[in-house]
Regions:
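Short boundary/loop segments of OB/S1/cold-shock single-stranded nucleic-acid-binding domains
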Residues: 1-16, 64-90, 148-168
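Long beta-sheet-rich domains in secretory-pathway and surface-associated proteins
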Residues: 19, 32, 37-38, 79
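Short, charged beta-turn/beta-strand-edge "cap" motif at the junction between a beta-strand
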Residues: 22-23, 61-68, 130-145
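Short aromatic-glycine-enriched beta-strand elements
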Residues: 25-30, 98-103
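A short macromolecule-binding patch
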Residues: 36-44, 109-117
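Short nucleic-acid-contacting surface segments enriched for D/E, G, S/T with interspersed K/R
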Residues: 45-60, 118-134
């Protein structure tokens, strides 16, 4: 298993925001703002002061995903409940598409699907490769939902139903 020292660019940590799009009990799914992908994690990766709800905005710090030598370990280093503390994460590539990849986060903590522009690599990604990155806990930015985002979700669902009805 690698560690934070295995990363070439691990010290290049950026701030990201996302919106809660699904809460399935122990797992929360986020749409990363800026069309940067989907992130699904267990709730122990969140600092939550409020109940989760659709459209709620969250923020965190994260480095780019990088390829690592060797196989992903069975666990990763867990951080303290501090939004500024960086956690070293490790994962295995589970899906490679033309312009995106998905990674399954070790210890069944969730998955991350992201566009290729969020990745640092010297060689093409392949299923089974190990990747690593630094990430902080995810913090809720407030109790309220982003109404514009929730409205967009409902509009997208409504259009999908209309298209399905037309095709049937």
């Amino acid at each position: 298993m690698g560690n934070t020292n295995s990363l070439k660019y691990g010290n290049s940590v950026n701030y990201y925001e996302g919106v809660v799009v699904e809460d399935r009990g122990d797992i929360v799914t986020l749409d990363v703002k800026g069309r940067l992908g989907y992130l699904e994690l267990t709730k122990d990766m969140f600092i939550a002061e409020y109940p989760f709800k659709l459209g709620q905005v969250v923020g965190w710090k994260m480095s780019f995903l990088e390829q690592l030598p060797g196989d992903a370990g069975d666990s990763y280093v867990r951080g303290v409940m501090n939004p500024d503390h960086t956690i070293y994460m490790e994962s295995t590539v589970s899906l490679v598409e033309d312009c995106a990849i998905s990674v399954d986060i070790s210890d069944n903590q969730g998955f991350f699907k992201t566009p290729m522009r969020m990745l640092l690599s010297d060689v093409p990604f392949e299923v089974g490769q190990t990747v690593g990155w630094n990430m902080s806990k995810i913090v809720q930015l407030g109790p309220d939902a982003d109404d514009k985002y929730v409205s967009n979700i409902h509009n997208r669902e409504r259009r999908a139903i209309e298209i399905s009805n037309r095709n049937n």
